[in-house]
């Protein structure tokens, strides 16, 4: 069925992540260090910490999207390139996360108030549904990262219409293992390792970057498939 035509892309993205794990470490370690630094200062300077983490994830998302989608392989041992593409991709990734997550949280909070059930029990299934139905929003940062040439035309509306829920299901399948890992991280004991950082916060950073790699890899493959369909 065409609804499930992109369900193999998350698995292919996982295989690429496993095969290119040394490249993942090379592309992500500086970005993860920046995110950890942002987390450490966020208690005192919340905006500085949030912006640092946002831009760091944008830098890595561009690198991984272009590695999977275009075959680009930066050769440096440490990678951190911040330019127009990375800023737009970071903003697009944040917008996609808000577009997908915020409605699920609002509905879960409303249901928790109305029914008396715990918010945590309600939000997980709603987040799963939201990723499946609205996950095509991640085509926004994908296009920002994969644009080629100065005359590249804006194809996002066309790609969202063609991808639809099929692209959202790919996002859901890529999001699911990361979410399960983050739930495990939440169960870690609260131990202060550094000033402003607990064990759980430090463990969550590499898990989130794995999640970015899985989602970005799946969406790069979906974008290439949609581009091939359009030609």
Go through each PLM region and give its residues.
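Hydrophobic alpha-helical membrane segments
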Residues: 1-231
């Amino acid at each position: 069925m065409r609804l499930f035509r992109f369900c193999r892309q998350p698995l292919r993205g996982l295989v690429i992540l496993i095969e290119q794990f040394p490249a993942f470490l090379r592309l992500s370690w500086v970005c993860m260090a920046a995110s950890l630094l942002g987390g450490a200062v966020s208690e005192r300077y919340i905006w500085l910490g949030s912006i640092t983490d946002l831009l760091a994830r944008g830098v890595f998302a561009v690198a991984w999207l272009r590695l999977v989608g275009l075959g680009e392989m930066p050769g440096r041992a440490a990678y951190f390139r911040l330019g127009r593409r990375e800023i737009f991709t970071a903003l697009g990734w944040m917008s996609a996360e808000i577009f997908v997550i915020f409605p699920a949280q609002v509905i879960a909070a409303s249901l928790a108030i109305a029914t008396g059930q715990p918010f945590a029990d309600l939000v997980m299934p709603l987040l799963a549904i939201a990723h499946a139905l609205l996950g095509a929003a991640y085509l926004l940062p994908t296009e920002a990262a994969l644009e080629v040439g100065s005359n590249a035309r804006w194809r996002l509306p066309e790609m969202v219409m063609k991808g639809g829920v099929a692209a959202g299901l790919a996002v859901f399948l890529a999001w699911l293992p990361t979410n399960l890992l983050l739930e495990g991280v939440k169960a870690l004991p609260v131990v202060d390792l550094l000033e402003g950082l607990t064990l759980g916060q430090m463990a969550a950073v590499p898990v989130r970057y794995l999640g970015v790699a899985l989602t970005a890899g799946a969406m790069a493959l979906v974008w290439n498939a949609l581009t091939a369909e359009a030609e």
